[in-house]
A protein has these predicted regions:
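Acidic, divalent-metal-coordinating active-site segment for phosphoryl/phosphodiester hydrolysis
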Residues: 146-149
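Nucleotide/phosphate-binding catalytic cleft detector across ATP-hydrolyzing
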Residues: 1-11, 19-140, 151-189
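Primarily the dimerization/phosphotransfer
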Residues: 14
Length: 189
């Protein structure tokens, strides 16, 4: 296999990111570029299940910027995935179709299990000591914008995993709502 250039796009609750890699059998993979754009997609989604038009516009502009970068790097293949914010939309198919029409990107909405499986897979690929670390009882916490994932490993296997809808963006939203309705907010927190 010759060298191939691949882009991984993550549409998350509070950030849209893209990593571009060079892949080959000889060297494995090498990161060429890492771009992150702060965009709180989960903000409206977690409270009302909707992505407002302005937020969709900014998302599509960002993805079109990513597309130009991909062309500059000669990207041959890509994978664009949406997580919690897109997963919890009341109209995910309509939003994914809008993204496709406006950017040309086919976005795959990952289930919670798929999202975390890919996360562990990437940790295992990057962290040399990962396999050794999960031989003995190990907990991995993944704090995202929409959820907190707790996974327990033992003897090189995933024993159990639990996802709690307590991500940083959700908690911040709840605290902001609480602050508006509570007299002694500072004492409560």
């Amino acid at each position: 296999m010759a060298v191939m250039t691949f882009a991984a796009i993550d549409i998350g609750s509070y950030e849209v990111s893209m990593k571009i890699f060079e892949l080959s059998k000889k060297i494995g993979f090498r990161e060429l570029n890492d771009v992150r754009y702060s965009l709180e997609l989960g903000k409206g989604v977690y409270s009302n299940g909707k992505l407002d038009t302005q937020m969709l516009d900014v998302l599509c502009e960002t993805l079109n910027d990513f597309k130009r970068m991909m062309q500059d790097f000669g990207v041959v293949e890509y994978r664009a995935c949406g997580t919690s914010a897109l997963r919890e939309l009341t109209n995910p198919l309509i939003i994914v179709e809008q993204i496709y029409r406006r950017t040309g990107f086919k976005v795959e909405i990952l289930s919670n299990a798929e999202q975390h499986f890919l996360g562990y897979k990437s940790i295992a690929a990057i962290e040399r000591g990962f396999k050794k670390m999960i031989q003995k009882g190990t907990a991995i916490l993944d704090v995202g914008g929409g959820s907190l994932q707790v996974s327990l490993f033992d003897k090189d296997a995933l024993v159990t995993t639990q996802s709690l809808k307590m991500g940083s963006l959700r908690i911040r939203q709840r605290l902001q709502e609480l602050e508006k309705t509570t007299i002694h907010y500072d004492k409560l927190v």
